């Protein structure tokens, strides 16, 4: 991965945690409006020069949670065979660590925010039973596509993956874990992941 791509990807990752709805998941008919509102709120936080870095991170994390299905994200990232090969307690621990890692990773990159804007494009059917919200990050260094993939559970829609300029966040983790699990046990791989 080139340095230019890495730098741009870091800026794009800032937006990942900005699209969650506080306290409830989304109804299909509300996805575009709610996502736009949440993005606007977080961008205001990122522009607030009176906040320290830690306050900014805390504010953004406060906005985040219930629209992402972090448990499903962890399960997909680990892979079906590896997930089914560990007991329920380890599944729960892995999900919690995975969620914390994602939140920390992206909140640590908030300082890279540089007046980018996000444009909501379309909400389209995706993989038959799913939806994809297409958005565009508009910045001084160029525009980048960010697509949010939703699935339905009990009449509400949750994010289970995000495609950044054509690269799936969850599939990237999955490839990383699969590579490690070829050489290590789950416990060894998990210990390494926790210590990263």
Predicted segments with their positions:
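Boundary at the C-terminal end of the N-terminal hydrophobic targeting segment
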Residues: 23-27
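Low-complexity, intrinsically disordered terminal/linker segments enriched in charged
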Residues: 161-196
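Short beta-strand edge/turn micro-motifs at domain boundaries
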Residues: 145-171
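Bacterial N-terminal signal peptides
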Residues: 11-20
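Early exported N-terminus immediately downstream of N-terminal targeting peptides
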Residues: 28-109
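Bacterial N-terminal signal peptides that target proteins for export
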Residues: 2-12
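A mature extracytoplasmic/lumenal domain signature
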Residues: 98, 124, 137-139, 150-152, ...
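Surface-exposed, charged secondary-structure patches
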Residues: 104-144, 196
């Amino acid at each position: 991965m080139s340095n230019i791509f890495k730098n741009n990807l870091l800026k794009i990752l800032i937006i990942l945690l900005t699209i969650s709805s506080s306290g409830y998941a989304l109804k299909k008919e509300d996805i575009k409006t709610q996502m736009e509102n949440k993005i606007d709120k977080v961008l205001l936080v990122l522009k607030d020069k009176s906040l320290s870095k830690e306050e900014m991170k805390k504010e953004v994390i406060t906005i985040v949670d219930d629209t992402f299905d972090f448990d499903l994200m962890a399960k997909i990232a680990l892979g079906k065979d590896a997930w089914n090969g560990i007991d329920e307690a380890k599944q729960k621990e892995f999900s919690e660590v995975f969620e914390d890692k994602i939140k920390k990773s992206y909140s640590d990159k908030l300082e890279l925010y540089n007046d980018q804007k996000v444009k909501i494009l379309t909400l389209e059917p995706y993989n038959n039973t799913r939806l994809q919200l297409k958005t565009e990050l508009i910045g001084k260094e160029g525009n980048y596509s960010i697509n949010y993939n939703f699935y339905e559970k009990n009449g509400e829609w949750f994010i289970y993956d995000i495609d950044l300029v054509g690269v799936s966040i969850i599939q990237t983790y999955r490839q990383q874990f699969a590579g490690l699990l070829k050489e290590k046990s789950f416990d060894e791989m998990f210990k390494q992941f926790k210590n990263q």
